[in-house]
């Protein structure tokens, strides 16, 4: 693995000279190996080690190299055709393989090769980009988007129209991460490498990037780039220092533990008690 990493790092430094016509066969094979590892979940762009998220930048670089190495080709989409560099993940699946992996895919859900989909997941008509990791028991609802290299935990619900940002366009340092047992409400956007920690509930229409103030109304703390574990978050605003206007903010209205979350419905958690 270390030798593979070093070869990818070296190639990435010289990427401006790489094209589908000039790429060395050995580099093509290396990138294909990485894409296959990501596709099977044998490697992931970020993983939690000793309680901290570690980003494996070289895997992200391999994904970026793939766009320089592979040429566009025709992809059969049944009633239509597509022309792209990245094949579809399920292009060679049959009934037995879908059953073995316990994945339900509702048309016209699109999942690019190089993304991992865990067991007992449900993909409604949605989009999962390459390098993404979607863990087991997760629901990706209609028109939700899981961006490149995003990390989605176990038993997560991404509601209709949710956008989870990617790292490739524009290039970001770290992927957006939704930890286990989170609920992301309809049409919310979590982007720019924000981490939503375990057991959090995000209401409908909440937008969080690295510059978004995440205000805890109980403690007065302001967080950036991280939603603390067990937070219940709604959209709101905070007054300016001069008091003449207010600016958008995400508001933590309460904290819940796993026991409370198991007993109480999502809608009940989102009711604000003044």
From Swiss-Prot:
Keywords: Acyltransferase, Amino-acid biosynthesis, Cytoplasm, Diaminopimelate biosynthesis, Lysine biosynthesis, Repeat, Transferase. It catalyses: (S)-2,3,4,5-tetrahydrodipicolinate + succinyl-CoA + H2O = (S)-2-succinylamino-6-oxoheptanedioate + CoA. InterPro entries: DapD_Trfase_Hexpep_rpt_fam, Hexapep, Hexapep_transf_CS, THP_succinylTrfase_dom1, THP_succinylTrfase_N_sf, Trimer_LpxA-like_sf. The keyword Coiled coil does not apply. Substrate binds at residues 104, 141. Pathway: Amino-acid biosynthesis; L-lysine biosynthesis via DAP pathway; LL-2,6-diaminopimelate from (S)-tetrahydrodipicolinate (succinylase route): step 1/3. Its EC number is 2.3.1.117. Its main location: cytoplasm. PANTHER family: 2,3,4,5-TETRAHYDROPYRIDINE-2,6-DICARBOXYLATE N-SUCCINYLTRANSFERASE, MOLYBDENUM COFACTOR GUANYLYLTRANSFERASE. Homotrimer. Belongs to the transferase hexapeptide repeat family. This is 2,3,4,5-tetrahydropyridine-2,6-dicarboxylate N-succinyltransferase. It comes from Shewanella denitrificans (strain OS217 / ATCC BAA-1090 / DSM 15013).
């Amino acid at each position: 693995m270390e030798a593979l990493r070093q070869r990818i790092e070296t190639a990435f430094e010289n990427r401006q000279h790489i094209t589908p016509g000039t790429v060395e066969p050995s580099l093509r094979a290396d990138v294909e190996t990485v894409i296959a590892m990501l596709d099977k979940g044998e490697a992931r762009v970020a993983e939690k080690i000793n309680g901290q998220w570690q980003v494996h930048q070289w895997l992200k670089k391999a994904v970026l190299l793939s766009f320089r190495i592979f040429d566009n080709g025709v992809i059969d989409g049944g009633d239509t055709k597509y022309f792209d560099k990245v094949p579809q993940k399920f292009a060679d699946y049959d009934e037995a393989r879908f059953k073995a992996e316990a994945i339900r895919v509702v048309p016209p859900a699109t999942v690019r090769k190089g993304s991992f989909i865990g067991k007992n997941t449900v993909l409604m008509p949605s989009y999962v980009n390459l390098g993404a990791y979607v863990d087991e028991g997760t629901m990706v609802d209609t028109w939700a988007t899981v961006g490149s290299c995003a990390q989605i935990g176990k038993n997560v619900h991404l509601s209709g129209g949710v956008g989870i940002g990617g790292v490739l366009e524009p290039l970001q340092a770290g992927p957006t991460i939704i930890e286990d047992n989170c609920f992301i409400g309809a049409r919310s956007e979590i982007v720019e490498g924000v981490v939503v920690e375990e057991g959090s509930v995000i209401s409908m229409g909440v937008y969080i990037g690295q510059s978004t103030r995440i205000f805890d109304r109980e403690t007065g703390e302001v967080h950036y780039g991280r939603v603390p574990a067990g937070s219940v978050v709604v959209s709101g605003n905070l007054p300016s220092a001069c008091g003449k206007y207010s600016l958008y903010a995400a508001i933590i209205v309460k904290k819940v533990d796993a026991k409370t979350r198991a007993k109480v419905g999502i809608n009940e958690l989102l009711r604000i008690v003044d």
